[in-house]
């Protein structure tokens, strides 16, 4: 599924590979969909390590970068697990 097909209120995942090795995975919750403007909460991991969380990530679906990315619908629990992983990493830093 392409970025133009994303629906508000749904969860998706994207994966990026280099030489068959998963290097980046993102989980998306689409919070707003208005014409070509898409807003999402996004959790991003690089090589299995939590990297970032975006609470208000904007996507313009004509952007060339996102045109080549394939989205797969996923369950809310997968997004939640990714957020929990980031929280664990942040708590570990506090020590």
Per-segment meaning from a language model:
Residues 40-41:
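SH3/SH3-like beta-barrel fold
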Residues 14, 18, 33, 46, ...:
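Acidic surface patches and DE-rich sequence motifs
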Residues 9, 24-25, 57, 84:
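Glycine-centered loop/turn motifs
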Residues 1-2, 6, 91-95:
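Short intrinsically disordered terminal tails
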Residues 47-95:
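Intrinsically disordered, low-complexity, charged/polar segments
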Residues 4, 29-32, 72:
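Short, exposed beta-strand/loop patches in secreted or surface proteins that constitute
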Residues 22-35:
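Short beta-strand-centered aromatic/proline hotspots
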Residues 4-18:
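Short coil-to-beta transition motif at edge beta-strands of beta-rich domains
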């Amino acid at each position: 599924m392409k970025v133009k097909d994303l629906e508000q209120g749904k969860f998706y995942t994207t994966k990026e590979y280099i030489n068959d090795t998963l290097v980046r995975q993102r989980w998306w919750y689409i919070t707003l969909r208005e014409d070509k403007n898409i807003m999402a909460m996004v959790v991003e991991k690089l090589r299995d390590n939590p990297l970032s969380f975006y609470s208000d990530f904007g996507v313009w679906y004509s952007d060339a970068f996102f045109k080549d990315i394939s989205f797969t619908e996923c369950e809310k629990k997968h997004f939640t697990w990714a957020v929990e992983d980031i929280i664990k990493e942040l708590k570990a830093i506090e020590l």
